[in-house]
């Protein structure tokens, strides 16, 4: 089994300056059309090659917002047994029922075989968490979701630059 670094944050003076500049400005949101948040959204959208990007205050807020787009009330959402507590909180905030499943010990990410075992009539959505810069087996997870008509929402808060099959 390989060793996985969970905490290796590199922050230099450039990041500290950008954070300080943003904190001292009056533009903490992108709605104004100016400022570092808008610049971040544009750069991040390009970096992950997506059509849109909305910066929020935390990973919890991002999950809460994303899950609010689906009617998960009284429905099960499959998530990994190892994640920050906010993953389950976001499900509960939206009325869903967290269904914890085991992980692949080599990646600390959801194990597709365990997902398959956990799917039942109440399952509505699968929420894989890409952890420590490692990607879940998205090919298998996407197939499971498609075959079972389940929604897929990915949590990449701990792996924003991670690639799966060459794609971020």
What are these regions (language model features)?
Residues 68-156, 163:
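PLP-dependent aminotransferase-like
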Residues 30-76, 90-94, 100-102, 167:
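Phosphate-binding glycine-rich loop
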Residues 8-11, 28-32, 100, 107, ...:
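Pocket-edge positions in alpha/beta enzyme catalytic cores
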Residues 27, 32, 158-166:
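Active-site region of PLP-dependent enzymes
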Residues 14, 35, 39, 61, ...:
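Short alpha-helical
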Residues 1-29:
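N-terminal "arm"/small-domain region of PLP-dependent enzymes with the aminotransferase-like
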Residues 44, 156-157:
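Active-site His/Glu-centered metal-binding helix of metallohydrolases
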